[in-house]
Amino acid sequence: MSETLGILKALADDTRLKILRALSERDMYVELLAERLQLSAATVSFHMKKLQAAGLVDSRREQ
């Protein structure tokens, strides 16, 4: 039940929905998402952490 609640809370935010929509088209790094959504990289990072905590996205560092 708490896992479902976490997912629903993550999906309740418009910005996070926009991020998920953009990522459904292709993988993107934070800076590109920020540019595309006209947000700061810090804002995108904040929301990505929430999406990761809910298990909705994975992240990786490019080398």
Predicted regions and their residues:
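Alpha-helical DNA-recognition elements
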Residues: K50
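N-terminal helix-turn-helix DNA-binding core of bacterial DNA-binding proteins
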Residues: S2-T43, A54-L56, R61-Q63
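Residues within the DNA-recognition helix of helix-turn-helix
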Residues: H47
